């Protein structure tokens, strides 16, 4: 019981820090579906997150959420799409929001791995759609280092954060492109 309270306290501290400060990091996102292919798909970019707000760039795409509007810009098509996402869509986009929604329906496990703390959330039943959610954080700083989402049917998504840091400054969580074609779906 004591371990569960410590694990829950670590997660709540992480979530509270993300509400108060902006997490800025480079990232590598890797997905692999063992049933379809053994070749992983890998993407790199950078991100900023503050509460529910986020901004990320990778290859020829930018995405941002300012708390109301989701902005997605494609360099290839020079198109800026604006939409109002549902809570479910936001949860699927932001792994920290996803972890928060999993807390009530999961059991927790925690273990020290060097200077990191690894927290594993395992759903009580299969209705969550995943097998487990693994979060690694730097113990001393509460900086997230990696997230693994083990989904049903052999799909694994890994988000590795490099050069992660907290800052008091928040970037713009909106995208404005003067010459872009705007597709407003709000």
Role assignments for model-derived ranges:
Residues 85-116:
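Flexible, surface-exposed loop/linker segments and immediately adjacent secondary-structure boundaries
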Residues 44-46, 62, 107-109, 132-136:
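Short, surface-exposed charged micro-motifs
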Residues 1-41, 48-52, 175-186:
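N-terminal leader/targeting segments and the immediate start of mature chains
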Residues 113-116, 124-131, 139-186:
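Non-transmembrane domains of secretory- and envelope-associated proteins
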Residues 28-34, 57, 73, 122-124, ...:
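A generic structural motif
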Residues 46-92:
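An acidic-aromatic
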């Amino acid at each position: 019981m004591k371990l569960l309270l410590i694990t829950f306290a670590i997660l709540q501290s992480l979530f509270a820090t993300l509400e108060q400060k902006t997490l800025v990091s480079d990232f590598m996102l890797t997905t692999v579906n063992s049933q379809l292919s053994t070749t992983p798909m890998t993407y790199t970019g950078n991100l900023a997150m503050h509460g529910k707000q986020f901004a990320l760039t990778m290859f020829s795409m930018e995405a941002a959420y300012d708390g109301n509007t989701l902005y997605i810009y494609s360099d290839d098509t020079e198109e800026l799409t604006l939409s109002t996402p549902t809570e479910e869509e936001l949860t699927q986009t932001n792994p920290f929001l996803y972890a928060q929604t999993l807390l009530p329906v999961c059991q927790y496990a925690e273990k020290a791995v060097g200077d990191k703390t690894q927290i594993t959330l395992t759903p009580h039943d299969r209705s969550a759609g995943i097998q487990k959610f693994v979060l690694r954080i730097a113990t001393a700083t509460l900086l997230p280092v990696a997230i693994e989402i083990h989904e049903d049917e052999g799909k694994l998504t890994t988000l590795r954060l490099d050069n992660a840091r907290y800052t008091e400054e928040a970037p713009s969580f909106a995208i404005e492109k003067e010459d872009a074609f705007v597709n407003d779906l709000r």
